[in-house]
Design a protein with these regions (language model features):
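Active-site phosphate-binding and catalytic loops of NTP-dependent enzymes
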Residues: 24-43, 127, 225-232, 255
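Glycine-rich adenosyl-nucleotide cofactor-binding module
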Residues: 32-33, 50, 57-105
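Switch/coupling sub-region of P-loop NTPases
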Residues: 89, 93-105, 118-241, 247-249
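Walker A (P-loop) phosphate-binding loop of P-loop NTPases
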Residues: 109
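Conserved lysine of the Walker
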Residues: 112
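Hydrophobic positions on the alpha1 helix immediately C-terminal to the Walker A/P-loop
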Residues: 115
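NTP-binding/hydrolysis catalytic cores, primarily Walker-type P-loop NTPases
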Residues: 254-324
């Protein structure tokens, strides 16, 4: 993991830093100033940039850059470093090809965007894909017909902004085979779910959650941010829209792993029903390699309940392999 560094700077350097910040944000049609002192942006190489200015940043401007690797992370690489096993990767590939709606959850720094990129590269190359992001960072290489859309901030008068909700609604008129929403944080969760429930199968997205159950609760809260809707109706929308949750985690040794794969099986009128297919189990060995976490993502013995999409895509039960 890349360490974080901090440094004290003179007023001259602070002014120079502000100039650099303005160049960065203006290059992607963003703005940051005292009245709007926080912004997320990106560099030309796709690196994520977070900027905080006075008066929020008391000691002066703060710039945090999260760089991407020079090479694209592949599923093969994730298997090599132990983030996922081959049999689970094959299982997810089958689900992507069969157009299951997959939601990736995890905490900050757990690798959600990286994993979304990797899964996206399983999408057949002849499909039309639309990506929608707050700040463009996805690097999908498997499809030629790719439409990328990015949020536009409002101007200083608070006008002419285009948010994720507007982009999702626009994307529905663009005849996509799949819609990929980089991350849902608020009311746009409802629009994403409605897209999933209106024939746009195979859609992918991510969100912050500490567990699959926590992610479902957070999605309920996000939907309520945008509409006054009965909780049962929200739960029903989530249960019918999302097929699979892949939960990622950053462990105490700073490794990133797939911790759980959960199928959403339905709604019983009160609760969203789930079926855990894979779960990470840590080896209980005292003093193992000086704090290195040892364990494996294991099949629970539960099989995929909703198999209709697999059959509709031309697969049979013999094509499903869960591994150990």
């Amino acid at each position: 993991s890349t360490p974080l560094y901090s440094s004290a700077a003179s007023d001259v350097y602070k002014r120079q830093l502000v100039d650099i910040i303005q160049q960065i944000v203006s290059g992607v049609n963003r703005r940051v100033n005292e009245s709007s002192p926080i912004v997320d942006s990106r560099l030309s190489d796709g690196s994520r940039v977070n900027v905080v200015l006075n008066p929020v940043a008391i000691n002066g401007p703060v710039v945090t850059i999260r760089k991407f690797p020079e090479y694209s992370i592949t599923m093969k690489k994730l298997i090599e470093i132990g983030s996922i096993s081959l049999n689970v990767a094959d299982f997810l590939k089958l689900l992507v090809n069969a157009k299951y709606n997959i939601f990736i959850s995890g905490g900050t720094g757990s690798g959600k965007t990286t994993f979304l990129n990797v899964l996206s590269n399983y999408i057949p190359g002849d499909e039309r894909i639309i990506t929608i992001e707050d700040s463009a960072e996805l690097q999908i290489q498997s499809v030629d017909n790719l439409v990328r859309m990015e949020v536009r901030q409002a101007n200083d008068e608070g006008e002419n902004g285009i948010d994720i909700r507007a982009l999702i609604k626009s994307s529905l008129r663009m005849r996509p085979d799949r819609i990929i929403v980089g991350e849902v944080r608020g009311a746009e969760a409802l629009d994403m779910l409605q897209a999933m429930n209106t024939g746009h199968d195979g859609s992918l997205s991510t969100g912050h959650g500490n567990s699959p159950k926590d992610m479902l609760n957070r999605l309920e809260t996000m939907v309520l941010m945008g509409v006054d809707m009965p909780l049962k109706a929200i739960k029903s929308q989530i249960a019918s829209g999302i097929d699979i949750i892949v939960h990622l985690g950053r462990l105490r040794d700073r490794t990133r792993k797939v911790l759980e794969i959960v199928e959403i099986t339905g709604f019983n009128g009160e609760e969203i029903l789930t079926n855990t297919i894979y779960r990470f189990e840590e080896d209980n060995i005292e003093g193992t390699n000086k704090g290195i976490v040892k364990g494996k993502l294991k099949w629970t013995g539960n099989t995929l309940i909703n198999q209709k999409k697999l059959f509709d895509a031309g697969y049979g039960k013999e094509d499903i392999s869960y591994g150990e």
